[in-house]
């Protein structure tokens, strides 16, 4: 079975580095264009997460795949935090904190995918990339809480938490041992 790739890349999609800055439906402020369709890159990443997380190798077919990879790795980080949460409210607080926590971007030490991502070419692009990734992180965390927590029990679903130990492409956005 092949890995799933993003189908959201358009010819006029803006790039930051070699990563697509795709539109998203978001309640958070940021540089991402507003999405008007039903599905955006975050929905796509969450939908394909359970299938893609098993792949150790992933062929990048377009710049949107780099955005998909980043969100997939971020979902793994979110699940590590959510497994320790006792309620959706606590999970949302954890996701907000994780979303705004300082994080490395391509080109900086500590970013695990520097071999596949181009660093921003100037200070302005650096700021736009950081803001876009933060917007993706915040919105992904919020939407993931809706998927992970069972509305009846207010506990994390074992069908999501079972993926905590899986590493997509043998990579992690957090350092070793975290």
Swiss-Prot record:
Pfam families: P21-Arc (PF04062). GO terms for biological process: Arp2/3 complex-mediated actin nucleation; regulation of actin filament polymerization. This is Actin-related protein 2/3 complex subunit 3-B. Component of the Arp2/3 complex, a multiprotein complex that mediates actin polymerization upon stimulation by nucleation-promoting factor (NPF). The Arp2/3 complex mediates the formation of branched actin networks in the cytoplasm, providing the force for cell motility. In addition to its role in the cytoplasmic cytoskeleton, the Arp2/3 complex also promotes actin polymerization in the nucleus, thereby regulating gene transcription and repair of damaged DNA. Belongs to the ARPC3 family. Component of the Arp2/3 complex composed of actr2/arp2, actr3/arp3, arpc1 (arpc1a or arpc1b), arpc2, arpc3, arpc4 and arpc5. Keywords: Actin-binding, Cell projection, Cytoplasm, Cytoskeleton, Nucleus. The lineage of its organism: Eukaryota, Metazoa, Chordata, Craniata, Vertebrata. Its main location: cytoplasm. The gene is arpc3-b. GO terms for cellular component: Arp2/3 protein complex; cell projection; cytoplasm; nucleus; site of double-strand break. It is found in: Cytoplasm, Cytoskeleton; Cell projection; Nucleus. GO terms for molecular function: actin binding.
């Amino acid at each position: 079975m092949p890995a799933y790739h993003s189908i959201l890349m358009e010819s006029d999609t803006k790039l930051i580095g070699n990563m697509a800055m795709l539109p998203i439906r978001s309640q958070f402020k940021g540089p991402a264009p507003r999405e008007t369709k039903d599905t955006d890159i975050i929905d796509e990443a969450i939908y394909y997460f359970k299938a893609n997380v098993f792949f150790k190798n992933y062929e990048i077919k377009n710049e949107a795949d780099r955005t998909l990879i980043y969100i997939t790795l971020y979902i793994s980080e979110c699940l590590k935090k959510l497994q320790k949460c006792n309620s959706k409210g606590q999970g949302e607080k954890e996701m907000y904190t994780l979303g705004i926590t300082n994080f490395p971007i391509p080109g900086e030490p500590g970013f695990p995918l520097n071999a596949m991502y181009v660093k921003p070419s100037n200070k302005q692009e650096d700021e736009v990339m950081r803001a876009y990734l933060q917007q993706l992180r915040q919105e992904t965390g919020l939407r993931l809480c809706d998927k992970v927590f069972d509305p009846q029990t207010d506990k994390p679903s074992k069908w999501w938490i079972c993926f905590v130990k899986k590493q997509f492409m043998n990579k992690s956005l957090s350092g070793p041992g975290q």
